[in-house]
Amino acid sequence: MEAVSSEYYFPLYSALGYFALVFGIGEIARIITAKYVSPRGNSQLFLYELIGTIQMCTCVYENGIIFKNYGFPAIFICVALLLTAGNIFNRGAMTNCAPIFEQFVFGNLGSSKFLTILSAQLIGATFASKFAYLIWNITAPYSTAHLENASNLECILHYKQTAGIVIGFEIVGAFVVRIVVAQLLARPALIKLIPFAISAYLSLALYVVGVPGLNPIVATARLYGCRGIDNSSFFILYWFCPVLGWLTGAYVVGQKSPSKKSAKDVKAEKKAKAAAKKSD
């Protein structure tokens, strides 16, 4: 009984070691970046985003082990904790293109920084699979779960619903998540629940649809090139749909462009400038 019990937790130990290694390497890379790369310009911003994206997308590859061996409750907790850890360690890296599209569209992010962040995310998504398989191959002699993953190069997407429902789920899901995030951000005591809210949606999508999206960068890293969906459908489903839902949610919660300030805001700014001049 004791032997069976210990074997049951072997995949968990493998996953925890994997996550610790990925975050450890990521943190070392961030420390080196902070020490040797100037915060002036976009170089440090690019590297932080690149490191964070590789780190988070590489961790997504290991989530399959958690779900396969421990089911929905475990994957919910796992994703929530990974997102929480990302918020702590990632130095502000977004690792998701939907928020930067939002900031750019509403005029809160310049084109230079927008392209810097987006290019870092795309490059990071490209390299995530290589890092995941590298770790699996190195640790395969010590982990049956990693040995199985390292030897399995086939990726097939299985959807539980029709195309229309899957598309609707992506749009509505991103819309709802954006609104929920806004509500939690408005209450400082509840901000820490944001990763759990996102994880709850992803777990629900996994149960209902079979292949969750929400984050186009993560979807690209993990799902692009898999059998079961062509390239055009992939970009519609995992890029256009979630970004559309996210931007719609941002519009509903009142994301404002700097060029569309209210008369009250403009008046307050003028008073502040006048007061500043008097103090000079």
Curated annotation (Swiss-Prot):
Compositional bias ranges of the Basic and acidic residues kind: 262-280
Membrane topology type: Multi-pass membrane protein
Subcellular location: Membrane
Keyword Lyase: no
Stretches of the chain found on the membrane's Cytoplasmic side: 1-8, 86-114, 186-193, 255-280
Cellular-component GO terms for this entry: cytoplasm; membrane
Membrane-spanning segments: 9-29, 65-85, 115-135, 165-185, 194-214, 234-254
Sequence ranges on the Extracellular membrane side: 30-64, 136-164, 215-233
Chief site of localization: membrane
Name of the featured protein: Putative aquaporin-10
Protein's organism: Caenorhabditis elegans
Source lineage: Eukaryota, Metazoa, Ecdysozoa, Nematoda, Chromadorea
